[in-house]
């Protein structure tokens, strides 16, 4: 958590968020009024936050990582913009630390060159479009970071992406896997493109597939920037 995010939470009189995320910061929000909702209730959650802000409350909407990266920042702005101008609350987007940044630091330095971030969740994005994006990024030799790589319902998506990338990259291309990045229970393993789907991967896992230049040395992934050594 960034210092600015911590300050925003401490200054708020209402804290809104996914129940799991509120539990992660329970020490910071003790004594504050909270609005917690379950997964798949994002619109309702953010609408309640906007309504509370219109009433004059100092509201914080909690996201994991960075609210502007697969978080609630965009939805809050969209809903706030529907409020008449004379009542519209101001919205500040507080930067956070995205899981891709934390996972990269755990693995070494895999993001030193161009990279893409792709979510494999097809709840709001067609799976064919996700595969197309993965294909284009693989063709462009970009390091590919995968959010939401596997769930109880999505058991084959990661294998399909692996097959797409294998069309363009060596099977021994390094792949880093980090579970619970930056949280208690963090676990890291470095595998390769041929075998990484055999590792334990879930919704709390971030996968980083190296590019054609990525290598592993002394247990760390490195994607060279191109400096002459």
Model-derived features: positions:
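Class I S-adenosyl-L-methionine
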Residues: 1-91, 197
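Class I SAM-dependent methyltransferase SAM-binding "motif I" and its flanking Rossmann-like core
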Residues: 3, 71-140
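Short, well-ordered secondary-structure micro-motifs
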Residues: 28, 72-73, 103-105, 128-130, ...
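A contiguous loop/helix-start segment that scaffolds small-molecule binding in enzyme catalytic cores
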Residues: 58, 139-229
């Amino acid at each position: 958590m960034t210092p600015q995010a911590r300050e925003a939470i401490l200054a708020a009189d209402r804290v809104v968020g996914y129940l799991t995320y509120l539990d992660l910061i329970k020490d910071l929000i003790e004594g504050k009024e909270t609005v917690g909702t379950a997964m798949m209730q994002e619109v309702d959650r953010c609408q309640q936050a906007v309504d509370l802000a219109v009433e004059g409350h100092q509201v914080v909407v909690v996201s994991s990582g960075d609210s502007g990266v697969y978080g609630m920042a965009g939805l809050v702005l969209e809903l706030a913009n529907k409020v008449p101008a004379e009542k519209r609350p101001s919205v500040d987007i507080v930067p956070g630390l995205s899981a891709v940044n934390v996972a990269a630091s755990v693995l070494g330095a895999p993001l030193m060159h161009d990279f893409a971030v792709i979510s494999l969740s097809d709840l709001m994005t067609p799976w064919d479009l996700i595969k197309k994006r993965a294909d284009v990024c693989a063709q462009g030799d970009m390091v590919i970071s995968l959010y939401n790589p596997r769930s109880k319902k999505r058991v084959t998506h990661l294998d399909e992406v692996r097959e797409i990338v294998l069309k363009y990259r060596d099977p021994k291309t390094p792949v880093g896997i980090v579970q619970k990045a930056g949280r208690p229970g963090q676990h890291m393993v470095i595998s390769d493109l041929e075998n990484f789907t055999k590792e334990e991967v879930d919704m709390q896992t971030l996968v980083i597939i190296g590019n054609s230049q990525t290598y592993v040395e002394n247990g760390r992934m490195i994607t060279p920037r191109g400096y002459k050594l």
